[in-house]
């Protein structure tokens, strides 16, 4: 607080400039949000004639009433029924995979146990393991790690749940323990599975941590550096989930004998995919979109809230905040999660109203109107808001010793005796937890009540304000000791910047107020020590305090209550709702040191109040048990993810095995092995091991390699003999072992296809793809052009469209297969896939109105009817300076409840608006799933510039080859504003999967050499 007096005038002026800029931006943003909210609310308030007559076109499903009741109780909205559905014949072939609406709620008396649900949880950053969690080691390894691990265990123990996978990043780094490099860690195996002796698949159940590599494998990256590697994680997660789903299907629902030996089992796809924090929310959104399964997200802490706090402090300009925290990238990931989420789990109503309300993709007033229309069964006019539900976090009470708890804090002889044993040299009479002596050695008088604070050393945890409150209150110092458990440390100078700053400030404050002998700050503790620390505080009749500036969950408050500790907690975030339930403490303003002091004194000095808070916490703590949490969670998922469309799993065509692949898997067993199914033992083990098939250095041994080979045999396909006529083989799914994707956007300045450049690209691709395995390689054209435009462009180049396995057109809105014949119809199954949440004609008129820049004329952005299709609204843009950028238009549409992808193509002369699930990268993943092609066997050719979605084509598990000099004009200038994130936050250009060919290099030869790798 003294720093401002030493600042120079330029420094003060800079701070004032930051504060003014923040105020201006905040006011402008809130005005835009209010305009969007009013417009959406006005449209939704209007009822059509049919709706006024009470004759809606659709009806809510049976679970709607329960969902609405739960939404009202939880402060969130209900899931809106989707109005834009594909034709019935499309739905019957490719319907969205939906959660079973019959899963029981928390209030029902009986629980059915024959569901065999598969649930996927995702938490990428930090150090995640099941035992000896290093909580507090760094800012990325905190309460979220403990929460997701315990959630995985608890869900796996819930009746009806067969398997839970917790996906996280694999870290093979000498700076961290070797366990973080293990591909799979088993968390639990249900007792019923352990007793299963028939080998029918019981061993596949339980909870597992599955670690997938992404980014540099020898580095432990902070979460701010993980963003460019998200696509690689998604691709590996997609492969893992697909393999597990198919193997589970073979075990749990094998085809009946009447279907024949070659029949494929029905895959057991995830019941829900749940992303935790912004990075995992983006992964979950992309994964759920690719698999067409429900998606749930939990924010844990939110980027917009953090941005506002940082800007209010006025110490960092927005550009510095972006560079340090990658905050714009984080916010966009959270918005992406809101676009795709069926449900958002929150810890408090305050989080819904004050934190999620800051986002473009959620407006409480609009959501409520959509909920009303849902109840009436009327159209939501293409608008969507995710359902927000409040589910209090759970806690594992298995570590709580009820006998000790009955004695702790009672003030009897037992408490005094335990403490006396630690002070008396003769301690052999009773073994006590070692952490007790480690803490009490700091105190001159260890008999005093203990104020306990337990958190990682993070500025947001606000420990320095607590120390100031303690140091400045003589009465508080005389009455109690203070214990600070701030993670683990060896040398402060070797710690990360934020943690080192906090710990240094703590030591300085202890010295300033001369608190030696009154404050404990041990360097190390184990996770198993934490219960003993709570018990010690309770024995001294102490108080637990959480003074965080904002606390999303407040798990430590629940833990403290479970051990009989009254609490003082921040009034910002989760503690508000927790204390409403537990009634075991007081809320304070974390910025007010005097209020913190008064609250602590109130509980420590008034023993009757202390006892009342203790009893109340113990009496109500069952409301936060994991079984209660999981039952409530599953009932909310069932209500939120219920859709009226027919339910049918994603079609995965069976693939015949080749004799060569089978022989390799069987160790040279010959052709006879090709038709043999996986043995039970291999099938069981395959569900427990997730190894990168393209990375032998990650192999878990010969057995793992054999399992991977067996899995590969199950989904591999016939390898045609190499010959000059190899391409004459049918293009049916399963015929290709690799794909070469031409995604170079060859346009002139006028937006027309540059035939000369496109011809070079096509000839290069075809010549590079020739080789010994030419018959096993397929070709795909991926473009922003329509299907007729793409076909005409290929023919103008002298290329036969039928030489391509697939054409991805209209920026991913359509896929067609030219080898099927002259009728180049779009893939109806893919159309059904992308139709989910498509606003259709409701958004068509909104885009030109919102997309034109100030002063632009109506003709500057007008509907291009010839380029439109069922799932693509195309608009002709006359002048790039007269239209707004993609990010701005998407933001405006989100504020009005419309969920779309937008792409400027054809050198900024056309804007394609396509469904949320449609894009060129997502269409490629769709083909890889449908055709059973490993993404590591895919190569994508791109130019140095291109459409605004070009940067999304680069990253992933596939090989990307950037060809110079092939594109005359791109559209990237209309992607985002300068104050947003950059391409470096989307794609790691130094990835070994991305190769940029140099000018003057023999491109054809170099490309051919690169393609040999796939």
From Swiss-Prot:
Pfam families: Glyco_trans_4_4, Glycos_transf_1, S6PP. Keywords: Glycosyltransferase, Transferase. Residues 29-41, 49-58 have a biased composition (Basic and acidic residues). Expressed in germinating seeds. It catalyses: beta-D-fructose 6-phosphate + UDP-alpha-D-glucose = sucrose 6(F)-phosphate + UDP + H(+). The keyword Oxidoreductase does not apply. It comes from the Eukaryota. Pathway: Glycan biosynthesis; sucrose biosynthesis; sucrose from D-fructose 6-phosphate and UDP-alpha-D-glucose: step 1/2. Its EC number is 2.4.1.14. Transmembrane segments: none annotated. Activity is regulated by phosphorylation and moderated by concentration of metabolites and light. One of its GO terms (molecular function) is sucrose-phosphate synthase activity. One of its GO terms (biological process) is sucrose biosynthetic process. Residues 29-108, 648-677 are annotated as: Disordered. Induction: Circadian-regulated, with the highest expression 1 hour after the beginning of dark period (in 14 hours light/10 hours dark cycle). The keyword Transport does not apply. Homodimer or homotetramer. Belongs to the glycosyltransferase 1 family. Plays a role in photosynthetic sucrose synthesis by catalyzing the rate-limiting step of sucrose biosynthesis from UDP-glucose and fructose- 6-phosphate. Involved in the regulation of carbon partitioning in the leaves of plants. May regulate the synthesis of sucrose and therefore play a major role as a limiting factor in the export of photoassimilates out of the leaf. Plays a role for sucrose availability that is essential for plant growth and fiber elongation. This is Probable sucrose-phosphate synthase 5.
